């Protein structure tokens, strides 16, 4: 029927926009020493490994096949020297969206713990349609949540820490 056809493909909100700073120095991709990337289609994972500014970073982006429209980034950091690493996440919103709202909330989990969730919403099609994206950090050993948008890792030489960032 009329109106059921796809008229165009709309770019969505990207909930995983990680940036990194080592000892207060924002990461610059041009400073990356040998980089290795691989894609494992069977496990739905894209892996990147690089070294920069005294740390080695391995991150894996996974499609969560049992959860449509969800993905996860797993990050492992190993220190080549004593270092403090700050990761921040910012949602990327396409320019054609209107009424963009960004907010953070703390939500309760079944086990009684609480997690901070970053949420971004916007409208398109002259306000008739809406889209929402959300993300949250899941800290592993050696990782500390600073805010809903940031985590900090403080490592001694040879130390290792990890976290995951889940988004939908």
What is each of the regions a protein language model found here?
Residues 1-168:
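Beta-sandwich/jelly-roll carbohydrate-recognition scaffolds of carbohydrate-active enzymes
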């Amino acid at each position: 029927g009329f109106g059921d056809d796809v008229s165009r493909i709309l770019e969505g909100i990207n909930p995983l926009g990680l940036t990194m700073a080592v000892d207060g120095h924002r990461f610059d991709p041009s400073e990356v020493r040998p980089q290795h990337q691989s894609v494992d289609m069977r496990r739905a994972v894209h892996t990147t490994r690089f070294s920069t500014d005294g740390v080695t970073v391995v991150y894996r982006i996974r499609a969560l096949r049992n959860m449509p429209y969800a993905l996860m980034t797993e990050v492992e950091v190993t220190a080549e020297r004593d270092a403090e690493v700050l990761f921040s996440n910012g949602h990327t919103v396409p320019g054609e969206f209107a009424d963009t709202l960004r907010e953070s909330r703390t939500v309760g989990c079944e086990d009684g713990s609480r997690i901070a969730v970053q949420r971004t919403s916007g409208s398109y099609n002259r306000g008739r349609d809406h889209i929402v994206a959300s993300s949250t950090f899941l800290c592993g050993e050696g990782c500390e949540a600073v805010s809903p948008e940031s985590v900090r890792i403080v490592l001694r030489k040879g130390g290792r820490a990890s976290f995951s960032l889940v988004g939908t």
